[in-house]
Amino acid sequence: MATAESRALQFAEGAAFPAYRAPHAGGALLPPPSPAAALLPAPPAGPGPATFAGFLGRDPGPAPPPPASLGSPAPPKGAAAPSASQRRKRTSFSAEQLQLLELVFRRTRYPDIHLRERLAALTLLPESRIQVWFQNRRAKSRRQSGKSFQPLARPEIILNHCAPGTETKCLKPQLPLEVDVNCLPEPNGVGGGISDSSSQGQNFETCSPLSEDIGSKLDSWEEHIFSAFGNF
């Protein structure tokens, strides 16, 4: 009985005079808790650093960014694919347009801006595409002229492969014929006389005849084109 009373007395003295807590790590002394604080339930455990930072009056600050290795992958290096508007579209020429352009090319290989604009109005093609066509046509003509200067086979070798009585035909030089250029005959009274009858026969054999519709279109186009040359 006496032992129980002594323990109750010690508990009452401890509640009335609680011991001071040790100094906090921050250096500030916490006030002693009141006797009623011992009877209250303990607060839930929370994040210690954030509570301590708020107690000292400092903002914990934003969270550190994630490491670079965990970020989104960088896009692959290199030139981006060209869009559909940046891609060059190939121009398809009709048979009438090609015949007219070849006809003008036989007259002049370097048409000026006025002639190109007239061709653009007749063929319904952009003037820039007509200029590119003449550039490509001049390059093609230079390549073909370079091939024409290649040495031909010796006459005695050709005679060995010819049948008897056909030596004169074998001695005739076999020059490459350009169908798209020579298909159109020289117009009478413009820039010269009539071409050789033998060359006209070769052109007639190698070229396919034009239809009446295309021929009528070319005739009407020639009148407009030749008027642009003047005294050419």
UniProtKB/Swiss-Prot annotation:
Assigned keywords, A-Z: Developmental protein, Differentiation, DNA-binding, Homeobox, Nucleus, Phosphoprotein, Transcription, Transcription regulation
UniProt KW Nucleus keyword: yes
Keyword presence, Transcription regulation: yes
Low complexity biased stretches: 48-57
Biased composition (Pro residues): 30-47, 61-76
Positions of the UniProt region annotated as Disordered: 22-92
GO biological process terms on file: cell migration involved in gastrulation; digestive tract development; endoderm development; endoderm formation; endodermal cell differentiation; gastrulation; heart development; hematopoietic progenitor cell differentiation
Major localization class: nucleus
Protein name (record): Homeobox protein MIXL1
Species of origin: Homo sapiens (Human)
